Amino acid sequence: TGLAIKGRRADVDTGRPGPRVAILGELDALIVPQHPFADATTHAAHACGHHAALNAMLGCAEVLTRPEVLSQLSGSLAFIATPSEECQNQPYIASLIEAGKLQLFGGKSELIAEGVFDDIDVAMMLHAGGANYTPSGFNGFVMKRLVFHGKSAHAGANPDKGVNAISMMRPALTLMDAQRDTFRDEAHVRLHGYIPEGGEAVNVVPDRAVFTLQVRAASPEAIQDASDKVDRCVKAVAIAFGGETEVQNIFGFMPLIAYDELDDVHQRNVQAIAPGAPFTRGIYRPSSTDMGDVSMIIPSLHGYFRGFAGTAHTDDFLVADAQQAYVDSAKMLAMDAIDLLWGDASCGRKIAALKCPMNKQTYLEKMRGFSSTLTFGKD
C-alpha cells in the first residue's frame, strides 16, 4: 500500500512458472464542476472514465482469481491501481517532488522509480471511450513553468522606470507561435498553456508573470527539440527587455509505443466479445498518458473500450451503455490475461521477450535529465 502515495497493488501466483502480468487501473478523477456527477465539495468527476477502467481491472481480478480459472494458468498476476495520471495540480505535485515525497511527475512514472514494475513482464490496461480500438501511440510531454521577472513602477506616473513582466511574456508567446512551422508533422508537436500569474494591481507595472506550458511530441528527441526552442524564445525576451526569465522543467510522460503482438491478442478477444462491432488499430493520439512510461520498459497494452458518449474531460462525458462500459471491458481484459497465461503461458512468454526501447536505468536517466531550472538575463 501507499505506492506513489495513493497507489495499491495485490498479487496472485498460480504456483507454476511463467511471466508476471500486471493489470492496471487508474484512480484519479478530474475537476469538472458542471459534470452531472461532480462531487459537491471537491467538484471532482470521472470525466475521463477512469472509474470504468478501474472496474474492468476489478472485474478481471474477480474472474482470474477463481480457482477453476487460476488452475489453468501459469505465472502470476499483479493488480495495480495507479494514481495521478491526469497531472492536474501541478504546483502540488512539484511541492511533493521538492519535499522528497515523490521523484517523478506521473503516478506510473513514480511507481517505476519506486521499483513497483521491476518484476513485471507484461503490463495491460484499458481506457474508456466511444469505440473499441488500440492506438498506434501517444505523445509524451514536458511541463515548463516560465517565470518573467521585470521591475515594478507606478503604471501612470512613471512606467518608464519599470520593466513590465506581461510585456516580456507577450513577445515570448508570439515567438513560440512563430516556431510552429519548424515542427515536423510526424513529430505531432503541441504547445499549450495558461497564465496563472500576471500582476497584482492595475496601477502597478507587474514585476512578475508566469506562463505554465506543456510541450508534447511523439518522441523524446522531438520533445527536447521543441522544449529547446521554447527556451530560446524566453531567453530572447530577457535580453530584449533587460529583465530576467526563468524556465522550470519537469518531465511529464514518455511517448507510448504499441506492441503489435499484444494488440493482436486484444483484437481477437474484442471481436469475440463484440462480433461485428467495429475495431480500429493504428489511431495516433497526440494526447498523453503515463502508460507511455511503462511501454518504454515493458511490453504494454493500452486499449480503448466503447460504452461512453460525449467528449472526454468535459461535462458531457457519460456512460451511454453500461454493458459495454462495465461488463464487456472486464471480459476483454480477463480474456487478454487468460490468453497470455493459459497452459504453460507460452503466449505471455513470447510477448514478455519483446524488445523495449529502454531499460529502467536508461528511462530514469532520461526522465531526470529533462528536469532542470534555467535562468536568462542579468548575468
PLM feature spans:
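Acidic/His- and Gly-rich active-site-bordering loop/insert found
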Residues: 1-47, 51-78
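Short coil/turn connectors at secondary-structure junctions
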Residues: 4, 16-21, 42, 71-77, ...
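Short beta-strand segments
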Residues: 22-26, 78-82, 124-127, 147-149, ...
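Acidic/histidine-rich catalytic neighborhood of metal-dependent amide-processing enzymes
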Residues: 55-137
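Buried hydrophobic packing segments
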Residues: 56-64, 169-172, 176, 333-337
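Phosphate-handling active-site elements
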Residues: 61-80, 176-187, 342-348
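Midchain, well-structured core segments that form catalytic/ion-binding scaffolds
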Residues: 112, 117-264, 268-270, 283-292
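Zn-dependent metallopeptidase/amidohydrolase metal-coordination segment
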Residues: 279-377
